Amino acid sequence: MPPIFHRNLTIPELVQWALKLEKDSRLTARGALAVLSYAKTGRSPTDKRIVDTDDVHNNVDWGSVNIKLSEDSFARVKKLAKDFLDTCEHLFVVDCFAGHDERYRLKVRVITTRPYHALFMRSMLIVPKPEELARFGEPDYVIYNAGECKADPSIPGVTSTTCVALNFKTCEQVILGTEYAGEMKKGILTVMFELMPRMNHLCMHASANVGKRGDVTVFFGVSGTGKTTLSADPHRSLIGDDEHVWTDRGVFNIEGGCYAKAIGLNPKTEKEIYDAVRFGAVAENCVLEKTTGEIDFYDESICKNTRVAYPLSHIEGALSKAVAGHPKNIIFLTNDAFGVMPPVARLTSAQAMFWFVIGYTANVPGVEAGNTRTARPVFSSCFGGPFLVRHATFYGEQLADKMKQHNSRVWLLNTGYAGGRADRGAKRMPLRVTRAIIDAIHDGSLDQEEYEVYPGWGLHIPKHVANVPAHLLNPRKAWKDVKQFNDTSKELVEMFQQSFNARFAAKASQEMKSAVPRYVEVSRL
């Protein structure tokens, strides 16, 4: 028998089907749908493939991020997925838009076996109004999510039982061997990183909000640096938490929802996100209390990458039409585990390009007794390395052009550690300190402060910020041992230089190269 197609179901209908068909799906105490993605609890970057076609061959930065797949192999991957989908009893179809700016939006169709995936994408994308759905017609882009079916490693270019393949020519994505929902939303982001530069628009892995005076702030950052938390501000309207485009008119959100890390979610300090996890939301790989059905946001027994997905409408004050003006402030978020970065610095144009393409953050090891792992840097180009299609310096120059054109201020904000290394017991920057800095950026007072230059790094550090302890502002003053500070600073500078020289130096402008940090020893703290 052919599959039964369930097209564009409502939230209650999708929840009902999930509870009926998915043995491990259940409702939380507050009505969110708790689901499991099983074996894969995160993206599979080594299994992502870009189809090598004539129209994109010269634009793609081929390598370990964008791995080639031939058109013939893609046809076989797609056939495997469609043949599997044809055997399923139930298929769920979601027709939605990607992009709040109607001039650039894509009509996206998702075909999947799991109601959870349909509900997820119904939140992640923009749900058409009834009249828009009536004239939706053929989609611009189709996602075939056959994640319950394993990929075939005998197909040339496929190296495991997982394959996430994107074809820009046929406007299709095929998913095999992974049920992690994030593959779908990041597929859309990758498509926009290819499409938007054709129109001279900058695609951004970033969150954004807007103040009452129309002042827009964009937050760049890799996963875990605070994009979602910091953009959900009770005094400002949320534009979006993850994927945006900067056009000739301003900023628009690609998505219709948010996908937040759930581990450690605190209802007191992250109330907006906590309150959003209710009926209509998806709680992915979260553990529930057996007796109450409440989510245990500190339980990592399934995975550390627990997630919650919810529509923008769940955030009080979020823009229903997520389009705003040009950014007044751009903030680069870094989770520095070495304790060398200041909590905030104002960047020059050259520094903005450098820090954007280098995309620095750090992986933080556990600090339990007996742990021998050390902190290590992560350099994710443009704070979204896994999703870039073109070379990072291309996007860096795009950003520099736009910030100069619109006089945007660029800031580096460290949400990581101060006074020492994370792997040696240093404490993370308190959220209240980070929020105080952001408040000072938004009210304009931080721009009026007196600044000093951080030796070697060249960063401009304020000498005072309201409600921020003075000893935190200059990193070396928070340390107790000058030798340890010098050794750590030298180690990090060398890793910056090595990463830049290996990945960007050949294509970087002289202006960008001038911002590469150098080591300067300090004699006292």
Annotate each language-model stretch with its function:
Residues 230:
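Hydrophobic positions on the alpha1 helix immediately C-terminal to the Walker A/P-loop
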Residues 227:
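Conserved lysine of the Walker
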Residues 472, 477-525:
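Generic C-terminus detector
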Residues 57-62, 167-172, 376-382:
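Gly-rich Lys/Arg/Thr-decorated short loops/hinges at beta-loop-alpha junctions or inter-strand turns
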